[in-house]
UniProtKB/Swiss-Prot annotation:
This is ATP phosphoribosyltransferase. Its EC number is 2.4.2.17. The keyword Glycosyltransferase applies. Pathway: Amino-acid biosynthesis; L-histidine biosynthesis; L-histidine from 5-phospho-alpha-D-ribose 1-diphosphate: step 1/9. InterPro entries: ATP_PRibTrfase_cat, ATP_PRibTrfase_CS, ATP_PRibTrfase_HisG, ATP_PRibTrfase_HisG_short. The gene is hisG. The lineage of its organism: Bacteria, Pseudomonadati, Myxococcota, Myxococcia, Myxococcales.
Length: 220
């Protein structure tokens, strides 16, 4: 492919597996296979005119917003927790999970007028959720082992992300409310969108077709 190579930021972990399957079907290149073959965090696919970089999921939006990557794959939880100036053309339908409110299954209702203590890494999402309900919650920032906070008396509830709920149940927690349904989104740097309009349009449409095929049940 002619022209400047376009950098795509893909998150490490499970989303790398799922996004690689989409790119392979859409463009014939697998970020995971390319990156597995090197110790570097970047690998080129010259035939597609792309360079893939593998970074922490929480950092993808920053790389794209500031132009270090033209395109990225980001969970909706990250985008809504810290809004960015990004073009968000496509729900990829992968990495599905939920941001929820959970409490200990043996927790007693709080006295009327008492603000609940809520442990979470989603400070903005949690604050907005309880504010919408008119509840003046005390938000306690944590970055790991959030599920144990209620049993240790640190918090009355947590706001966390879950896929199956198994870790919550293992720690005696029950889901009480949904905060946000989450899936991975394709995001694009706005300057890159102007500089590489046609190439990025083709990339987006190729992924859109694959996502539509995946979402549509096949008739037998």
């Amino acid at each position: 492919m002619n022209g400047e190579i376009i950098t795509v930021a893909v998150p490490k972990g499970r989303l790398l597996e799922e996004s690689s399957a989409l790119f392979e079907r859409a463009l014939g290149v697998s970020p995971k296979r390319l990156l597995d073959g090197t110790r570097k965090l970047a690998a080129d696919a010259p035939e597609a005119g792309l360079r893939f970089i593998s970074i922490r999921a929480a950092d993808v939006a920053s790389y794209v917003e500031h132009g270090a990557a033209a395109v990225g794959i980001v969970g909706l939880d990250i985008l809504r927790e810290e809004p960015r100036d990004l073009y968000e053309p496509l729900d990829l339908g992968i990495g599905r999970c939920q941001v929820i409110v959970a409490r200990h299954k043996q927790a007693k209702p709080l006295p009327r007028g008492v603000a609940p203590r809520v442990a979470t890494k989603y400070l903005s999402l949690a604050a907005h959720h309880f504010a919408r309900k008119g509840i003046p919650a005390e938000i306690i920032p944590l970055h790991g082992s959030i599920e144990v906070a209620p049993s240790l008396g640190l918090a009355d509830a947590i706001v966390d992300i879950t896929e199956t709920g198994e870790t919550l149940r293992a720690n005696g927690l029950v889901i009480e409310e949904l905060v946000l349904d989450v899936s991975a989104r394709l995001v694009v740097n706005r300057v890159a969108l102007k500089l590489h309009a046609e190439r990025l349009r083709r990339l987006i449409e190729a992924l859109r077709r694959v996502c539509a095929e995946t979402a549509t049940p096949k008739v037998r």
